[in-house]
């Protein structure tokens, strides 16, 4: 039979563990929600610790990337999770854009010379560890070396596209 003091200590430890776990779980779920902790410039929206701005003035991929760097000290959006893609998708859909494609920061500077599509990189230099292709770019007949979100996929999947086309784009930046 346990002594009352031992039982009390065990109850306290269990309560402490449960409180810690709920705090950790709460922290994790907060990372996935749009953040109200940061204030973005007018016309931009916060998600996590970044601001996102959808620019509807069409540019080539290179000019769009330069624009994100010059105006926001950021990059074309680099999408690292399904939660982030869902957020960006809703941002694009809510803009009522008539465009079928939106530039993101993914590109293949090797122009397909590396095997198995391994040349694809984020313009921000973030490591490409999450893949969400609408179609495999390394076997497409009409290859492009810059990536877009496509309306066909609900702006949730990536597709390779000709970098010289002029399209709207999404910038991602910190404030």
Curated annotation (Swiss-Prot):
SMART domains: CLECT
Keywords: Disulfide bond, Lectin, Secreted, Signal
Organism domain of life: Eukaryota
Pfam families xref list: Lectin_C (PF00059)
Residues covered by the C-type lectin domain: 38-175
Disulfide bridge partners, by residue number: 40-51, 68-171, 146-163
Gene3D superfamilies assigned: Mannose-Binding Protein A, subunit A
GO molecular function: carbohydrate binding
Keyword Signal on entry: yes
GO cellular component terms given for this protein: extracellular region
SUPFAM superfamilies per the UniProt record, alphabetical: C-type lectin-like
Tissue localization of expression: Expressed only in CW animals pancreas and to a lesser extent in duodenum. In pancreas it is found in acinar cells, but not in islets.
UniProt signal peptide: 1-26
Keyword Flavoprotein: no
Expression induction or repression: Found 1 and 2 days after cellophane wrapping, absent by the 6th day. This period coincides with islet neogenesis.
Compartments, as annotated in UniProt: Secreted
InterPro entries for the chain: C-type_lectin-like (IPR001304), C-type_lectin-like/link_sf (IPR016186), C-type_lectin/snaclec_domain (IPR050111), C-type_lectin_CS (IPR018378), CTDL_fold (IPR016187)
Predominant cellular place of this UniProt entry's protein: secreted
Functional summary from the UniProt entry: Constituent of ilotropin, which is a partially purified preparation of cellophane wrapping (CW) pancreata. Capable of initiating duct cell proliferation, a prerequisite for islet neogenesis.
Protein name: Pancreatic beta cell growth factor
Organism, as annotated: Mesocricetus auratus (Golden hamster)
């Amino acid at each position: 039979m346990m002594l009352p003091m031992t039982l009390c200590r065990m109850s306290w430890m269990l309560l402490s563990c449960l409180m810690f776990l709920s705090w950790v779980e709460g922290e994790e779920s907060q990372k996935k929600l749009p953040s109200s902790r940061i204030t973005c410039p007018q016309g931009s929206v916060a998600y996590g610790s970044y601001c996102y701005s959808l620019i509807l003035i069409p540019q080539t991929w290179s000019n769009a990337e330069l624009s994100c760097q010059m105006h926001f000290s950021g990059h074309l959006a680099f999408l690292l999770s399904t939660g982030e893609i869902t957020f960006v998708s809703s941002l694009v859909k809510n803009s009522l854009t008539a465009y079928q494609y939106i530039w993101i920061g993914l590109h293949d500077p090797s122009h397909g010379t590396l095997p198995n599509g391994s040349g694809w990189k984020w313009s921000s230099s973030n490591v490409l560890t999450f893949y969400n292709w609408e179609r495999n770019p390394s076997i497409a007949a009409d290859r492009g070396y810059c990536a877009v979100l496509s309306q066909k996929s609900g702006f949730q999947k990536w597709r390779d596209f000709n970098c010289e086309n002029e399209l709207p784009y999404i910038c991602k930046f910190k404030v």
